[in-house]
Amino acid sequence: MSIFIGGAWPYANGSLHLGHIASLLPGDILARYYRSKGENVLYVSGSDCNGTPIAIRAKQEGVTAKEIADQYHEEFQRCFRSLGFTYDCYTRTDSEHHHETVQNVFLRLLEEGHIYKKIVEQAYCETCTQFLPDRYVEGICPHCHEAARGDQCDACSAILDPLDLLEKKCKLCGSTPSVQETEHFYFALHTFQEQIKRAVEIAKQTGTWRDNAIQLTERYVKEGLLDRAVSRDLPIGVPIPVEGYEDKKIYVWIEAVTGYYSASKHWAEETGKDDQEFWDSEAKTYYVHGKDNIPFHSVIWPAVLLGIGEEAIPRHIVSNEYLTVEKRKLSTSKNWAVWVPDILERYDPDSIRYFLTVNAPENRDTDFSWREFIYSHNSELLGAYGNFVNRTLKFIEKYYGGIVPKRSIEVELKDKVEGLYKHVGEAIEQTKFKVALETIFDAVRFANKYFDEKQPWKQREDDPVSCEETIYNCVYLIANFANLLEPFLPFSSERVRNTLSIVKRNWEPQNTLPSRIDSVQPLFERIDVKQIEHEIEKLYGAVK
């Protein structure tokens, strides 16, 4: 089976925060899981280096957009590597390859009659002497009357045109813009109305899109899909490949999602492999992002793919809700966020991955609290999983000289483990990652209870054979926990596998166990609860 996984492209205009990771982490869990099943996986993403936020920040700081993009693209790569993300291709939208691919898609849509020219009115700043596309305009949403940008309202998810806003202001200088006529290219989105309607109906029947994606897309379809501009007067971006229009750029909403396609093509060129299998109707596709990106993946990207004759429209849309911090909405402008480079300096990446999975905003907004994060690490990772692994392996090291006693696996435990692979695998494929991880940790708690009830410290003297059976079965559980947890907790899983000298990582029960263990070290370290107060003080102290 061919599995395509696309992770949303973060804007390279500032550091990643935990809200980004909460929405993107499911992609890596899926990629690791499907690879362990032996499926053909292509997992791609990249840094959005053409967006308006980058141009605005560059102008504000008096540097080039490329300098800003370079800085954060490199930082993103370091963060994703440190968190264990296993992208097959992580690229950037200001690359020559991406520009060429996007221009080819634009020309194909133009040739097929899906793009046309139109004279329109657009916001123009007399002070800055330039047209103001999308995020260059801020104001009040006409639908919910909350603060909004010119391209979209985060409060109600409405897709907007800058002229829709009430109380419009230029993002650069704060002036009230005027309105002037200009010519732009438009995408005939309305012609895909029935196909998008059918796609959301299928998703609703099969449960392959998150509820928020279904509800929002149904709303767009009910209101009727409107044609959207595909060109803008922007300082950076992909130039329109039409003579006489080279000074205009392809609008980021169509250019950025085409990054999935350009990354796929780039991967094919780099590896010499054929990527077409990931774009036919048999491919299983997952798109992983936050709810603010829903319309771009449930409406616009499917329409673009259909327009160029590709069949692999998004089958699974994994659109998480928002993550708050200490019960307050994340705000990068106010510095109310937990920044990824910062948290990685002090905490185990598996602790971050664990918390953002069991506390994932899968169907509703959830909160990151330092208290819950640290107590979660100490009680679940250290107290449950780490405790079971260490008490078992230390027992072997102390009483058997590191030699694993060879006995038989209990039928009940074997059935339980086989059931775990089945149920956890099904939950992952259905994008129920929290359920999947909680199912494994239920088994971890069962394993601790098993150890306590068997009392090997007593069996060793009263019934040595039973003691060996207990320990052998505990090693069996540990080997399989490391395997089952690999998509979620790759770093600790690798440490366990190294201790047990296990190389095989297929998604199936590990029945062949090691004959000996080496260098047993604690799987996790306890975090001092005094850190809670320190982290909260640091968070409040950084607020602007």
UniProtKB/Swiss-Prot annotation:
NCBIfam families, per database record: metG
Name of this protein: Methionine--tRNA ligase 2
The record's free-text note on cofactor binding: Binds 1 zinc ion per subunit.
Superkingdom to which the source organism belongs: Bacteria
Subunit details: Monomer.
Gene: metG2
Residues annotated for ATP binding in this entry: T332
Compartments where found: Cytoplasm
Natural source organism: Bacillus cereus (strain ATCC 14579 / DSM 31 / CCUG 7414 / JCM 2152 / NBRC 15305 / NCIMB 9373 / NCTC 2599 / NRRL B-3711)
Residues spanned by motif 'HIGH' region: 10-20
GO cellular component terms listed in the entry, alphabetical order: cytosol
